[in-house]
């Protein structure tokens, strides 16, 4: 086959492949099953000693679903689907030190197991064990200021978890 024919054949094959891919219905929005319109997000179980983390993380996940606009958050009785889970890890570890070996920052790591279920068809649509969010925060002069920064880090980790969960549960279909 001549070089010119080979180029035309390659171009034709590429165009055919592109047209076929375009007809596959690929969308950046995802293809959540049509019958799913609502989701319930019960308060996550907290298997750690960090009191209150479950409320902060659950609220962030509810807000992430609400912001996405893909599923309306409702009570369990009215839901087509449910996102449930548990917080399995909450660790604060030393991260950086200054030249005098004074602690300068921490890393907060929150670990969860989550599951997204279709209640109408009684099937698990997505689940993940060991979903992790990590946030660093600086040490402040006063202990109370450092605690306040840790609380802010928990909120940031919760936002990250919310984005990850909605990304997996809704946008990856």
Residue ranges and their predicted role:
Residues 49, 53, 104, 149, ...:
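Conserved acidic
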Residues 1-23:
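Sec-dependent bacterial lipoprotein signal peptides
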Residues 6-7, 41, 84:
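Intrinsically disordered, low-complexity Ser/Thr/Pro-rich tracts
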Residues 28, 67-71, 82-128, 135-152:
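Surface-exposed short loop/turn segments
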Residues 4, 32, 102-104:
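Short, surface-exposed loop and linker segments with low hydrophobicity and enrichment for Pro/Ser/Thr
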Residues 13, 146, 158:
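Residue-level marker of regulatory loop/turn positions in helix-turn-helix DNA-binding domains and
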Residues 23-63, 67-79, 92, 120, ...:
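A structural "domain/chain start" motif
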